[in-house]
A protein has these predicted regions:
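Residue-level signature of outer-membrane beta-barrel architecture
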Residues: 33, 71-75, 107-110, 119, ...
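Outer membrane beta-barrel
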Residues: 72-190, 223, 398
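Repeated loop/turn-to-beta-strand initiation elements of outer-membrane beta-barrel proteins
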Residues: 33, 77-82, 112-115, 167-170, ...
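Detector for outer-membrane/organellar transmembrane beta-barrel domains
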Residues: 232, 263-285, 289-365
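Transmembrane beta-barrel strands of outer-membrane/channel proteins
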Residues: 37-45, 84-88, 117-119, 172-176, ...
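Outer-membrane beta-barrel "beta-signal"
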Residues: 349, 395, 407-421
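Hydrophobic, lipid-facing positions within transmembrane beta-strands of outer-membrane proteins
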Residues: 63-69, 101-104, 155-159, 212-216, ...
């Protein structure tokens, strides 16, 4: 049995060939393949004059042209399908040209089950830009530079199995490791407490049976409430850095999580609750300062319509560090001190105008314990069904030892224009 699981893992960890073969077989029997895509321009300008280190894109952290080609199809019976999204981008701000496989997967479905193999984007949990049981990879560079929200999530090379035999739905994901895309000095300015001048390298987990990532979810409805339970055996997706001789090495420690969520109507709005426990099996006593201390995380959110075409959403989020005394004892000099209980509140206000062709959106993070903030206003206008433009900002501030305050020199404004075909 173990050998069979290991083999399935290796297949799921290197999806491109298998997905392409499955997609090709589906396309061969498809009644027709639907083609689409878009062309997009995205320019980001820093809001203040700052002294940038050598090698950092300073005045314009991003200046990107991107084209996406999408193809999808299914066979005549509808029980097999495929989807592919390929992006070609050129960012002159950092001299980067790449062909990116955003998604590439094949689907097989039946009345009581389905399977998806390939690169796919997955979203779990009920938080609005707050993630507890969603441990899948994310692109924080795209987020902090104002890319369309679809680019916050990165695709996982995975095998996803769904079963819906009755009132409960079951989902199992077997995936290879993929790290978050985290801010670096290529585009961002931030304090670095690690020694300067030492070379850095990261060691990513392998895809053998000991390093595979497995996540599961069970969900269902009780009256008008949706309930879900989650478990995962994954990795932290940001590197844990430590000095090793004459270099700095980043690893991705193991992460085990378990949690639950529920959402349903309360009054004239919707209440959302989610909680989870983050276990660091490589440092359960909290004495390795490079590995995140085990934590309890939770959020409560409420959203409702204020008036026609206007909605308001509020959230309160907390992280409670389990072994705080060990964390304080082993924290290296020069590193900012975290509170045992980190508290964050969020607010989202959305207003539609002009028959919903214009959308004003305001999202704000407020660090209640770290005394910092991150405000994201945006205005989008659809000139037609195919063409839209969005202007917005990423405004960070507050105390510099906070998550958002430490990035305040990276506040920016952006303009995105997209034509879809």
């Amino acid at each position: 049995m173990t050998a069979e699981i290991s083999q399935a893992v290796r297949i799921a960890a290197s999806m491109a060939a298998a997905s392409l073969a499955l997609a090709s077989s589906v396309a061969a029997g498809a009644e027709g393949v639907a083609w689409g895509g878009f062309a997009q321009s995205h320019v980001v300008a820093r809001t203040s004059r700052v002294d940038c280190p050598s090698g950092t894109a300073c005045d314009f952290p991003a200046a990107e042209l991107r084209g996406q080609l999408k193809a999808e199809g299914k066979n005549s019976s509808g029980d097999a399908a495929f989807l592919a999204r390929l992006d070609l981008l050129r960012d002159v701000a950092v001299d980067d040209t790449r062909l990116v496989t955003r998604e590439l997967f094949g689907d097989l479905t039946s009345e009581k089950a389905s399977a998806r193999l390939g690169r796919q984007v997955m979203t779990w949990g009920v938080g609005d830009l707050l993630f507890i049981n969603d441990t899948f990879p994310k692109d924080w560079v795209a987020f902090f530079t104002g890319q369309p929200m679809q680019y916050l999530k990165l695709g996982s090379d995975a095998l996803k199995l769904n079963a819906f035999p009755g009132p409960a739905n079951f989902e199992l994901v077997i995936a290879g490791f993929r790290p978050d895309n985290t801010p670096t000095s290529r585009r961002f300015i931030f304090a670095d407490p690690l020694p300067a001048g030492l070379p850095r390298r990261t060691l990513e987990p392998g895809n053998d049976s000991g390093e595979v990532e497995i996540s599961g979810r069970i969900s269902g409805y009780l009256h008008n409430w949706e309930l879900a339970g989650y478990v995962s055996r994954t990795h932290y997706r940001s590197p844990a850095w430590r000095v090793a001789g004459a270099e700095i090495v980043g690893t991705y420690p193991r992460l085990n999580t378990a949690g639950a969520s529920l959402t349903g109507p309360v009054g004239k709005g919707v209440l959302s609750i989610e909680a989870g426990y983050y276990d660091s099996p490589q440092d359960r006593n909290g004495r390795d300062p490079s590995i995140e201390n085990p934590q309890f995380r939770g959020l409560v959110g409420y959203s409702r319509q204020l008036w026609e075409d206007a909605t308001l959403g509020l959230q309160f989020y907390g992280e409670w560090m389990r072994d705080y005394a060990a964390y304080r004892e082993t924290l290296p000099a020069g590193f900012p001190v975290k509170d045992r209980l980190r508290k964050v509140a969020t607010v989202r206000f959305t207003q539609f105008f002009a028959h919903q062709t214009a959308i004003f959106n305001l999202f704000a993070f407020v660090g209640l314990s770290e005394e910092d903030r991150y405000v994201i206003p945006s205005l989008r206008y659809a000139f037609s069904d195919n063409l839209w433009a969005e202007a917005g900002a990423n405004l960070l501030g507050g105390k510099r030892n906070g998550m958002f305050g430490s990035l305040q020199d990276n506040s920016n404004v952006y303009l995105t224009v997209r034509y879809a075909f």
